[in-house]
């Protein structure tokens, strides 16, 4: 048997539905579109969100908020995630990328305080939450804020 001789098992495939090809196909004449009406016409379908002239949901709901142009998007790491590193190691953006803890850095790296840290580590990041600094110091580590 060759690769070009492989065929699906008998009964495993169905013939495709040939629409509008005469009465014998079972889908002739109206071609599964029913009788008349907008959806039976060529190009005839309502656009997404159209509710028959009623004010659509998207326009009934209020607009809310905005995104500041100066918004910074930090890569986030929690203190508990730093447990994977060996005691005494220096942790920076490169080390976190290699460990797969962050996907990439846009506007910097921020360390947050979720989880517990038991090892003394040197952590270099652009920002730290106050509690994250406390937890790193309590574990005997040091915090270094690097500029962008």
From Swiss-Prot:
Subunit structure: Part of the 50S ribosomal subunit.
Region entry Disordered, spans: 1-61
GO BP, sorted A to Z: translation
An MF annotation (GO) of this entry: structural constituent of ribosome
Pfam families: Ribosomal_L27A
Keyword Flavoprotein: no
Compositionally biased spans, kind Basic residues: 30-39
Organism from which the protein derives: Geobacter sulfurreducens (strain ATCC 51573 / DSM 12127 / PCA)
Family: Belongs to the universal ribosomal protein uL15 family.
Biological function: Binds to the 23S rRNA.
Domain of life: Bacteria
Protein name: Large ribosomal subunit protein uL15
GO cellular component, one term: cytosolic large ribosomal subunit
HAMAP family: Ribosomal_uL15 (MF_01341)
Keyword RNA-binding in record: yes
Keywords annotated in UniProt: Ribonucleoprotein, Ribosomal protein, RNA-binding, rRNA-binding
């Amino acid at each position: 048997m060759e690769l070009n001789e492989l065929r699906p098992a008998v009964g495993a495939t169905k013939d495709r539905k040939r629409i509008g090809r005469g009465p014998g196909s079972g889908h002739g004449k109206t071609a599964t579109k029913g009788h008349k009406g907008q959806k039976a016409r060529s190009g005839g379908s309502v656009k997404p969100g159209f509710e028959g002239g009623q004010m659509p949901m998207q326009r009934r709901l209020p607009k809310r908020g905005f995104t500041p142009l100066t918004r910074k998007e930090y890569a986030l790491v929690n203190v508990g995630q730093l447990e994977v590193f060996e005691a005494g190691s220096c942790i920076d953006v490169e080390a976190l990328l290699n460990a797969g803890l962050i996907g990439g850095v846009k506007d910097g790296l921020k360390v947050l305080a979720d989880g517990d840290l038991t090892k003394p580590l040197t952590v270099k990041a652009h920002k730290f939450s106050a509690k994250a600094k406390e937890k790193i110091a309590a574990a005997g580590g040091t915090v270094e804020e690097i500029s962008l």
